[in-house]
Amino acid sequence: MFEGPVQDLIDELGKLPGIGPKSAQRIAFHLLSVEPSDIDRLTGVLAKVRDGVRFCAVCGNVSDNERCRICSDIRRDASVVCIVEEPKDIQAVERTREFRGRYHVLGGALDPLSGIGPDQLRIRELLSRIGERVDDVDVTEVIIATDPNTEGEATATYLVRMLRDIPGLTVTRIASGLPMGGDLEFADELTLGRALAGRRVLA
């Protein structure tokens, strides 16, 4: 254990995803060795993120405006909505250059052991979005692109039950080919592009 602010910094860094105690310690001592101006830039960026970044009112993507750039782009096909778990998954799909629709971010996946149920996800917003015809366009297809792991598959199954009886709506799931237990964000562009192109109809 170190004293005072140094240990506080290590503790806070250790709360970040994928950062263990040793990594937190290395990052902390790196920060102690850089120029004060570098620290000032980092804290300035963090303050801008805290104060200026919000979630898109339509899809839940990160944005610095009420609507993200994708929901604001009239060239995107508003009738097709790809459902993902997190904003980072949008970037994974965008890298494929295979999808020209819009997105809906759930904010996670069903995980009862961690206390995450349907009410903790943006499922109500999805149903409202389909029913209210955003931008006067009917949503005719939703593509479920949750992660190919236990939580993602459970979420996909739940979504199918909620969506399958909506008239005029086709529910599809990205095709197999992604490694089971993996995360969408780590899939290469070719594999994910093929999974999108080969999506299967569920309802």
Curated annotation (Swiss-Prot):
Annotated ranges, domain Toprim: 79-179
Assigned keywords, A-Z: DNA damage, DNA recombination, DNA repair, Metal-binding, Zinc, Zinc-finger
Alphabetized InterPro entries for the sequence: DNA_Rcmb_RecR, Hlx-hairpin-Hlx_DNA-bd_motif, Rcmb_RecR, Rcmb_RecR_Znf, TOPRIM_dom, TOPRIM_RecR
Zinc finger (C4-type): 56-71
Pfam families: RecR_C (PF21175), RecR_HhH (PF21176), RecR_ZnF (PF02132), Toprim_4 (PF13662)
The keyword Metal-binding appears for this protein: yes
GO terms under biological process: DNA recombination; DNA repair
Transmembrane segments annotated in the record for this chain: none
SMART domains for the chain: HhH1, TOPRIM
Family per record: Belongs to the RecR family.
Stated name of the protein: Recombination protein RecR
Organism listed in the record: Mycobacterium tuberculosis (strain ATCC 25177 / H37Ra)
Gene: recR
